[in-house]
Curated annotation (Swiss-Prot):
A Gene Ontology cellular-component term: proton-transporting ATP synthase complex
Higher taxonomy: Eukaryota, Metazoa, Ecdysozoa, Nematoda, Chromadorea
InterPro entries: ATP_synth_F0_gsu_mt, ATP_synth_su_G_mt_met
Gene designation per UniProt: asg-1
Protein name: Probable ATP synthase subunit g 1, mitochondrial
Keyword set includes S-adenosyl-L-methionine: no
Length: 131
């Protein structure tokens, strides 16, 4: 008796099933790695790290003051530029995440206090009297 040929969707379902089972087996190990890396990388600097940070900052200042950047190769300068841009871009992404809005801070229409509104109205009234 001949076996029936699997359709495209049956093959797809079999493939996704195998991939899912593999990923489900790997998940606990990957989660443990993610937690360990996150705990290490996202931790604030310890007091023991401060001297190394100061030394690196001093080296960077000396590098800029003595204009050693003119001696960099094209590849090195592109790598350093890419790293600097990445830091700047992630800063802006963090700002967007922090304010929970992409284009700026959401300011309610009644943000201006009553006191400020009263002062503006008084200035307008005085300006109208003078005119």
């Amino acid at each position: 008796m001949a076996t029936h040929k699997l359709s495209f969707f049956e093959k797809l379902a079999n493939t996704f099933g195998a991939l899912y089972r593999h990923q489900a087996q790997q998940f606990p190990r990957r989660l443990a790695i993610l937690k360990a890396v996150g705990k290490h990388e996202l931790a604030p600097p310890r007091s023991a790290d401060i001297p190394a940070i100061k030394a690196d900052w001093a080296k960077l200042q000396k590098f800029i003051e003595t204009k050693q950047y003119v001696n960099l190769s094209i590849k090195e300068s592109l790598v350093y530029s890419a790293v600097a841009l990445e830091v700047v871009f992630w800063f802006f992404v963090g700002e967007m995440i922090g304010r929970r809005y992409i284009f700026g801070y959401i300011v309610p229409a009644n943000y201006v206090s009553k006191d400020t509104k009263a002062k503006v109205a008084e200035k307008k009234r005085l300006a109208a009297l003078e005119a």
